[in-house]
């Protein structure tokens, strides 16, 4: 059992401890690699200002690297008795190298210790989310290129509206994901400032090498004001979840479309068989569970965001409430990462029924084209609109391919500007 870092030797109620620790030790298992990495940087920083000798530094770094290897191998497991990863790390160091282990927390609080570990974790998660979203966008871009001229009906209010194309539909998701990636990258830049060295939120009477420690951990800079760092906890997490939500909102719209287009009454799209499930009683069923759960996953992220936003309505300084932002942040990121990992493979396996989509482009879908044609001939548009509306039933079948080719304004079905979208995605490549 670890000695809790705040324990002064008095009796502590066991039920209260369980209530305040909650599942923090389990969440800290996921942060342990980052906590160990930040502790190594902190130890080297302490040695640079003379708090630790070279021998103490080397012994501590050596043992921390051993702990890191054990953690990576799955051999370093936290328990409820540890309370959190911070106590477990210090206890392990004290057990292995004695008094030098007791010096590791000099100039540091659990407040900035958890902040830096969390920021390192969040930075990696945002990097993966951006990469996954870009992979999904590239799969959709490939689809848009392959099916650029494949007609399908375009819908508004879930009613047939105008001729569209699979390429145009797919390109809308490419641009939506590109926007979301911009938000994720901007959020990543916000996270990329090192809070370590702020202690409990008011600095410490040591000349800590905050810049050197930040550099060793790969941060772009230092979060300057320790109180601002402490009060950013939860606010930064809300921004992270908002960025994840934007990726998920685009994925949810795609999932909704796939769900509708795959239903038997439309059957425009066939999901890859490996991405469907069955019924326990109806032998014929191929259920699109994956897209249904993709829709719901967006709500999970949105719920996590609302949870964090509610928790952070606090005055300045650290408050234990902030511990409870860790769970929803991880839960929301887990959902976003799981969904974004799956997206490219799902898109790559889609099959389209061109004949069914073509048949669904009925004569009334060409009403707007006809009104515009009359306007070009000199009829005021509002008069043309009313004339066509009065003659809807008599509209002849149109040429969907010609309709698409005629819409040549930038980004329209006849001018998808896919190379522009590709260049935008290339700028996100790491």
Swiss-Prot record:
GO terms for cellular component: cytosol. Its EC number is 4.3.2.1. GO terms for molecular function: argininosuccinate lyase activity. PROSITE patterns: FUMARATE_LYASES. InterPro entries: Argininosuccinate_lyase (IPR009049), Fumarase/histidase_N (IPR024083), Fumarate_lyase_CS (IPR020557), Fumarate_lyase_fam (IPR000362), Fumarate_lyase_N (IPR022761), L-Aspartase-like (IPR008948). This is Argininosuccinate lyase. Keywords: Amino-acid biosynthesis, Arginine biosynthesis, Cytoplasm, Lyase. It is found in: Cytoplasm. It catalyses: 2-(N(omega)-L-arginino)succinate = fumarate + L-arginine. One of its GO terms (biological process) is arginine biosynthetic process via ornithine. HAMAP family: Arg_succ_lyase. Belongs to the lyase 1 family. Argininosuccinate lyase subfamily. It is an enzyme of class 4 (lyase). Pathway: Amino-acid biosynthesis; L-arginine biosynthesis; L-arginine from L-ornithine and carbamoyl phosphate: step 3/3. Gene3D superfamilies: Fumarase/aspartase (C-terminal domain), Fumarase/aspartase (Central domain), Fumarase/aspartase (N-terminal domain).
């Amino acid at each position: 059992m670890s000695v809790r870092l705040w324990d002064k030797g008095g009796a502590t109620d066991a039920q209260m401890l369980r209530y305040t620790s909650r599942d923090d030790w389990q969440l800290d298992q996921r942060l342990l690699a980052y906590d160990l990495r930040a502790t190594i940087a902190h130890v080297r920083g302490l040695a640079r200002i003379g708090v630790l000798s070279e021998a103490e530094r080397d012994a501590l770094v050596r043992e921390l690297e051993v702990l890191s290897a054990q953690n990576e191998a799955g051999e370093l497991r936290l328990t409820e008795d540890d309370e959190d990863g911070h106590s477990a790390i210090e206890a392990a160091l004290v057990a292995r190298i004695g008094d030098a282990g007791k010096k590791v927390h000099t100039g540091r609080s659990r407040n900035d210790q958890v902040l830096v570990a969390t920021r390192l974790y969040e930075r990696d998660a945002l990097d993966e989310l951006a990469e996954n979203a870009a992979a999904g966008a590239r799969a959709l871009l490939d689809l848009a290129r392959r099916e650029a001229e494949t007609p399908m009906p375009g819908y508004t209010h879930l009613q047939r509206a105008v001729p569209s194309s699979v390429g145009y539909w797919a390109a809308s998701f490419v641009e939506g994901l590109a926007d979301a990636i911009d938000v994720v990258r901007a959020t990543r830049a916000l996270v990329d400032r090192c809070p370590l060295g702020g202690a409990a939120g008011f600095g410490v009477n040591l000349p800590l090498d905050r810049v050197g420690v930040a550099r060793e951990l790969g941060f772009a800079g230092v979060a300057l004001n320790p109180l601002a760092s402490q009060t950013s906890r939860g606010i930064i997490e809300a921004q992270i979840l908002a960025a994840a939500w934007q990726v998920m909102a685009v994925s949810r719209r795609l999932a909704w479309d796939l769900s509708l287009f795959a239903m038997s009454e439309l059957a425009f799209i066939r999901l890859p068989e490996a991405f469907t499930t069955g019924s326990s009683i109806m032998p014929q069923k191929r259920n699109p569970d994956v897209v249904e759960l993709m829709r719901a996953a967006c709500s999970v992220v949105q719920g996590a965001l609302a949870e964090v936003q509610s928790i952070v309505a606090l005055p300045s300084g650290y408050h234990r409430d902030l511990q409870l932002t860790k769970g929803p942040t991880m839960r929301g990121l887990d959902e976003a990462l799981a969904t974004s990992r799956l997206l490219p493979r799902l898109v790559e396996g889609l099959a389209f029924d061109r004949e069914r989509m073509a048949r669904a482009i009925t004569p009334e879908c060409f009403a707007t084209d006809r009104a515009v044609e009359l306007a070009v001939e000199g009829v005021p548009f509002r008069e043309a609109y009313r004339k066509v509306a009065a003659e809807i039933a008599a509209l002849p079948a149109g040429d969907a391919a010609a309709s698409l080719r005629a819409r040549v304004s930038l980004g329209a079905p006849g001018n998808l500007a896919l190379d522009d979208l590709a260049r935008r995605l290339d700028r996100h490549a790491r």
